[in-house]
């Protein structure tokens, strides 16, 4: 009877992929029955229900096999995010860069203090603050399309989101030595690991970005192969980052930044991933929900609420402060700050990195960060809609959008 499967049955990666997609699609469908509940929250709730804290269909071993799928999802999302950071725009509008750095710094300082007062060790509080300074472009782009928003606030906020995520990773890397020291790591790990991961990921991302640009530029007549070059470049970069123990988050982010700033005609950055991109997006959030520990989430619920309120005030306050100093319109500053409130991809990725480097801190950090992600992705859409109306940019986009532009907008929102 050797031909029969062993018991208990173990799932391979392909089975896990199918399971995550089916469960995620179910969660997304159910979320559509409630107008106030975004699909992202539905994905996370279904993951929590079927994860180790719920029905345990997705146990720890199954989730471990989904890592490659989550890495691909994060790589694609962060590559798209990197395409939002145009350095020439920052040179033209210096105050935009100052605004991004000031708002990010204020958020890190305030969140660190609040979490420290709440009982977190100072290094861990700083690490969580570095994670949650990141912002998600998904809500911004999706709601902008829904309300037909267009204008200065809409475009410049994309750059601020990219700045937030770069600052998040840099601050996370800078704070790693403090957490490692408090965890009793060796000095070689404390000093060399963050340096190696940061500069190694930077070099890998720059190299991959240059290669993707050259390949797509030299073969620009064969447009049918551009998507293969881009997807292949992102996956190769993510894979090499794992092989060399670099950051599978920062490297694809840098890849996107390099491609965007090398090209002159946006031929690569406008490439559409298509509906298949949504599949990995579903996998990412179902996996994130499954990794939540219900007991820790309930225990730390007051901290999550405190984090949500404090981070929101810091984001808006930082942008408004710089705008006031530069005499910019208050309504536009408040709108930008509100559009920076949603949080998702980078935060989830850095939470996974924290769990890998510091298993003893994984449960509490995941409960706080992922709990906040669920809240921010729920309140994000109505906040964004209000922000676009406040800025006076809702309804300003062309009423008749081309199918190509529409596909690009929807894809980026994913």
What are these model-derived regions, one by one?
Residues 212-221, 257-275, 312, 316-340, ...:
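Membrane-interfacial segments at transmembrane helix termini in multi-pass membrane proteins
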């Amino acid at each position: 009877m050797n031909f029969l499967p062993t018991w208990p049955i173990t799932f391979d990666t392909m089975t896990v992929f199918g399971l995550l997609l089916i469960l995620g699609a179910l969660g997304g469908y159910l979320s559509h029955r409630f107008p106030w509940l975004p699909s992202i929250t539905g994905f996370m709730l279904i993951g929590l229900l079927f994860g180790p804290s719920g029905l345990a269909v997705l146990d720890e071993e199954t989730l471990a096999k989904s890592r490659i799928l989550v890495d691909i999802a994060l790589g694609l999302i962060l590559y798209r995010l990197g395409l939002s950071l145009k350095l020439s725009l920052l040179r033209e509008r210096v105050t935009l860069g100052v605004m991004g750095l000031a708002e990010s710094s204020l958020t890190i300082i305030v969140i660190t203090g609040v979490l420290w007062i709440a009982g977190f060790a100072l290094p861990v509080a700083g690490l969580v603050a570095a994670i949650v300074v990141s912002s998600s472009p998904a809500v911004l782009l999706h709601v902008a399309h829904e309300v037909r928003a267009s204008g200065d606030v809409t475009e410049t906020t994309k750059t601020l989101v990219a700045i937030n995520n770069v600052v998040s990773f840099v601050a996370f890397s800078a704070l790693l030595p403090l957490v490692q020291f408090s965890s009793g790591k060796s000095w070689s790990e404390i000093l060399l690991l963050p340096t190696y991961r940061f500069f190694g990921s930077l070099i890998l991302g720059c190299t991959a970005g240059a290669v993707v640009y050259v390949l797509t530029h030299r073969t620009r007549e064969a447009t049918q192969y551009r998507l293969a070059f881009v997807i292949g470049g992102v996956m190769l970069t993510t894979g090499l980052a794992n092989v060399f123990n670099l950051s599978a988050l920062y490297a694809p982010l840098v890849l996107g930044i390099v491609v965007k700033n090398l090209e002159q005609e946006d031929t690569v950055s406008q490439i559409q991933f298509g509906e298949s991109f949504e599949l990995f997006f579903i996998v990412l959030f179902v996996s994130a929900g499954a990794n939540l520990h219900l007991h820790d989430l309930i225990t730390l619920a007051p901290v999550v609420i405190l984090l949500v309120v404090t981070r929101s005030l810091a984001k808006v306050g930082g942008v408004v402060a710089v705008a006031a100093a530069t005499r910019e319109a208050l309504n536009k500053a408040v709108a930008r700050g509100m559009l920076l409130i949603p949080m998702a991809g980078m935060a989830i990725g850095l939470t996974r990195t924290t769990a890998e480097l510091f298993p003893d801190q994984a449960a509490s950090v995941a409960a706080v960060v992922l709990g906040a992600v669920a809240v921010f992705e729920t309140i994000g859409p109505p906040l964004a809609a209000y922000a676009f109306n406040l800025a006076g940019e809702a309804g300003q986009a062309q009423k008749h959008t081309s199918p190509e532009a529409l596909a690009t907008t929807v894809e980026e929102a994913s």
